[in-house]
């Protein structure tokens, strides 16, 4: 059963086990288990009860859950299953925005909000935040990849300005600690930089 999405459903089981071990978010654990069993309607009924209860919790409890959840799902392809839209909209996003107000000098909520402005703010507050650094590099390079994806016929944007953006990604790359991540990102950056330079030489 579910063989074609086995990794996704294994993620649900692992996350349920982790939530149950903590002991505070048992309904979220039950949601994951019912979803893993393919019982979507029952799972979302449980999730809605959990959301209703969590919305009434103090900020500290909501922050603890959101921090645990986002740390748990980081890098997982099953993120959309572990954080369905109702949970994202009603708990995760409001809590993150409140967090930036309650703790203005904390990098973590900015890291998880994850747009370019907030990722840059996260690194201002904590230059050692590896997740924020990696996310920002990837976001910058996806923008560049969009600009170059019609080459050699057309460039979407300003290649000269985008070379400066690539140089920012190269600067950020120096702070990546994981050598595997660093090598992979370096290859991505080098390929895009070469594509822009070749386009400019051919003009």
Give each language-model segment a name.
Residues 1-8, 33-48, 81-93, 115-119, ...:
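Helix-turn-helix repeat elements of alpha-solenoid scaffolds
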Residues 50, 98-99, 122, 176:
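Canonical positions in the second alpha-helix
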Residues 16, 32-36, 124:
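Hydrophobic/aromatic side-chain positions at a characteristic register within alpha-helices
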Residues 1-14, 199-203:
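Eukaryotic intrinsically disordered, low-complexity segments enriched for acidic and Ser/Thr/Pro residues
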């Amino acid at each position: 059963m579910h063989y074609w999405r086995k990794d996704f459903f294994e993620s649900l089981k692992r996350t349920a086990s982790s939530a149950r071990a903590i002991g505070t978010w048992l309904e979220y654990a039950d949601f994951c288990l019912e979803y893993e069993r393919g019982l979507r309607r029952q799972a979302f009924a449980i999730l809605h009860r959990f959301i209703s209860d969590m919305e009434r919790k103090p900020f500290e409890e909501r922050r603890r859950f959101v921090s645990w959840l986002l740390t748990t799902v980081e890098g997982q392809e099953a993120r959309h299953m572990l954080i369905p839209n109702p949970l994202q909209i009603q708990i995760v996003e409001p809590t993150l925005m409140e967090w930036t107000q309650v703790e203005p000098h904390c990098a973590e909520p900015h890291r998880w909000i994850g747009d370019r402005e907030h990722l840059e703010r996260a690194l201002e507050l904590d230059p050692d935040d590896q997740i924020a650094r990696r996310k920002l590099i990837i976001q910058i390079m996806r923008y560049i990849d969009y600009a170059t994806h019609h080459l050699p016929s057309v460039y979407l944007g300003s290649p000269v300005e985008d070379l400066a953006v690539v140089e920012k990604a190269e600067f950020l790359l120096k702070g990546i600690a994981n050598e595997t991540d660093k090598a992979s990102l370096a290859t991505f950056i080098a390929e895009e930089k070469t594509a822009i330079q070749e386009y400019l030489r051919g003009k």
